[in-house]
Amino acid sequence: MKSKKLCAAVLAATLGLGFMAATPHSEAATRAELAQISVNQKGTNFQYWNKDAKSYQALVSYVKDVTNPKSQNYIPIEDRIAVFDLDGTLICETTPSYFEWMMYLERALNDPTFTPKAEDREYAKVVKKAIYETGIPGDMERKEAKSQASVFAGMTLPEYEAYVKKFMQTPAEGMNNLKRGDSFYLPMVEVVSYLHANNFKIFIVSGSDRQALRILTDGIMPIEKDNIIGTDVWNLASHQGNTDGLDYLYEKNDEVIRGEFVLKDVKMNKVSNIAREIGQQPVLAFGNSSGDSSMFNYTIVNNKYKALAFSLLCDDTERELGNQKKADKMRASCEKYGWIPVSMRDDFKTIYGDNVTRAK
């Protein structure tokens, strides 16, 4: 009986402190445990950053400055807008590629319940070869997005949600002890929590499918579903067919289904979507690739407020599936444009927890 009471007390203490406070980066965090990560307004309880990292110091110094009403750089709460890319910024994008690209391959090539169009199956083979062998060419983003929309077209929103959630349970290829849906970067989840504690309104602006983003991030971080911007497909009524939405009446026997590709939310399209959907210039931007460059510059150029852009460098080849060549190229871009580099190798105490390792 005493041992049971002791176990109960320990469990209660663990939940009260938060999982990460009780077991600092000792194992891979589940989604429920990721959701417990909480950084206070003063930022005194960051656990997963090296405190001597210039990027960490720049962020904390900035937030203290712009949230201080006595500072000349004070930013009113309504103007504290922070935008985050997802893949490679908040979650792993190298297992061995983006979450949604790997899910597309599963749907087009391996799903026994689905027969894709011949052209989608053949293009999925091209994408798979690019991911595993030849490298992804610049024109593949748009083509993949169109084919991805095609293989999921006709699904109701609940059906698509179930498919995404199922794929989230698959192992993160190339890593040990990690699922795709759990592969969030612990230090970056802390950043989101810290900014939320300081009354920043946080948006995700990603090249991934908008609905997939909502499902993938749900419950992990304090980001509302309507604050998620991503690649879009048409949403149609199930009996609408080719009828224009101006000429169709949604009726009781209809359901909303997924349709064709609309827009890939990368590069300048990120800026266009921010201007249209947020309606004001961000003051903080976080990303990791050339697809975020326009978003970075839009944030820091001609801003009436003090603004910063942070770019993660994929330079950790021991704890993560990094790429030093890409990291060096992004560091050079940071120096050129005035973005702040974040070294995953040097600035993060851990990425997923010490029990998560690269597969040999």
What kind of region is each of these model predictions?
Residues 93-96, 101-104, 215-216, 298:
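Short, solvent-exposed loop/turn and secondary-structure capping segments
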Residues 96-98, 102-182, 186:
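A metal-dependent, Asp-based hydrolase signature
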